[in-house]
């Protein structure tokens, strides 16, 4: 009986994902990293002249403003960048 109860508790914790954190792609989208506390956005940075080639990806707390040369795209779901 104790084993069954322990199993139910473990399954509940795994299913609820109590320690939810955001996952963002690294520069190569096959790899991702778990964002630290406070960094609740994923971002992708690329040069305006080459919009299909991202320069940097990762976690960030506030989305930076784009400029004439660099564009930032931010989102808040897992691996959205």
Curated annotation (Swiss-Prot):
InterPro entries: Cytotoxin_Cobra, Snake_3FTx, Snake_toxin-like_sf, Snake_toxin_con_site, Toxin_cobra-type. One of its GO terms (molecular function) is toxin activity. Residues 1-21 form the signal peptide. Shows cytolytic activity on many different cells by forming pore in lipid membranes. In vivo, increases heart rate or kills the animal by cardiac arrest. In addition, it binds to heparin with high affinity, interacts with Kv channel-interacting protein 1 (KCNIP1) in a calcium-independent manner, and binds to integrin alpha-V/beta-3 (ITGAV/ITGB3) with moderate affinity. Expressed by the venom gland. One of its GO terms (cellular component) is other organism cell membrane. Belongs to the three-finger toxin family. Short-chain subfamily. Type IA cytotoxin sub-subfamily. Monomer in solution; Homodimer and oligomer in the presence of negatively charged lipids forming a pore with a size ranging between 20 and 30 Angstroms. It is found in: Secreted; Target cell membrane. The keyword Disulfide bond applies. It holds the Pfam family Toxin_cobra-type. Disulfide bonds join 24-42, 35-59, 63-74, 75-80. One of its GO terms (biological process) is killing of cells of another organism. This is Cytotoxin 4b. Keywords: Cardiotoxin, Cytolysis, Disulfide bond, Membrane, Secreted, Signal, Target cell membrane, Target membrane, Toxin.
């Amino acid at each position: 009986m104790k084993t069954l109860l322990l199993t139910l508790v473990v399954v509940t914790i795994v299913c609820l994902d109590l320690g939810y954190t955001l996952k963002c792609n690294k520069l190569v989208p096959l790899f991702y990293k778990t964002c630290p506390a406070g960094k609740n956005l994923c971002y992708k940075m690329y040069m305006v002249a080459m919009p299909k080639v991202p320069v940097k990806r990762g976690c960030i707390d506030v989305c930076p403003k784009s400029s004439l040369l660099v564009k930032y795209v931010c989102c808040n779901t897992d691996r959205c960048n």
